[in-house]
Amino acid sequence: MKKSIILLNILLIFMQGDIRQAAAPRLPDGPIEIVVPAEPSGGWDVTAQAIQSVLRQKQIVKDDVHIVYKSGGGGEKGWKYVNKSSKQTISMTSSLILSNDLLGQSKLKMSDFTPLAILSKEWQTVALPKGSALTNGKDVLNEINMHPGKVRIGFAPGFGNDDQLSFVRAADMYGIDPFDIQFSQYDSSEQLIQALIRHEIEAASMTLSEAKPYERNGDITLAAVTSDKRLPGFPNVPTWKEQGIPFVFSHWRGILGPKNMSEEEISYWDQALKKVTSSPEWKRKINEQDWESFYLNSRETKRFLEEQSAFYQSIMTGN
């Protein structure tokens, strides 16, 4: 009997240890902030609001979730804020944080943050104002060829982002010197669209989800998309490939946190964001926006960002 009691006590100790190890990881108490390093509206904002909504509805986190807007410097202001914030603060990110570094526009590097997740990807498009004499992407490129430095192409929010780089890449593949393109930079997609509608620019390079509501309203038309084939929601929008330019390019969005997050804190977000991206609500939002689900956890994200950094360096240097 005595041996049985001792054995039972040993088993209980091991079970308690297992329970402690299996306990869900936690963040310090306090409200969670999701930083949008741009103006309200646009893809980062839509993504942040979707995350906030699912975290609240599904009660994935116990504390409240706030969205904080920090626009300026092509994401720089927002990422500096995250860099100095508590462990309850996370931020939207994209390839812009990589290109800012590669172009020497920022002292911040990806190593100054903790990669937490990649969430989704979507396609880039070239938009034209209603009544434009141009009809497709090739028309835009031909116009630049005929009038170098005269055709205004808008993008937002920061130099070196995917909106700008995707257009540069398509133009380069068509034989256009990037210095012959007159770019106009805007602080938000809303400002960009309004400039396009007012014919202040000849075309705008942007994500498909940002262009969609204005295309549906008939305010703009779409001249090209960077997908490999026509998209079901946009059957009349030709790909660059159809126009003789073998260019396929997707834009991704993700989440980062402050530097030096603990393994427990990283694990917390691995679990929380996995639940978010697995939820029906998230999948509905993905479909509404014509995005593609592209969830990567923290470890996969770190590896992905290393690959993307090399990819963007090759685009910018031509090597």
Swiss-Prot record:
The keyword Cytoplasm is assigned to this record: no
Signal peptide: 1-22
Coiled coil stretches, renumbered: none
SUPFAM superfamilies xref list: Periplasmic binding protein-like II (SSF53850)
Keyword terms, alphabetized: Signal
Database matches in Gene3D superfamilies: Bordetella uptake gene, domain 1, Periplasmic binding protein-like II
UniProt family annotation: Belongs to the UPF0065 (bug) family.
Name of the featured protein: UPF0065 protein YflP
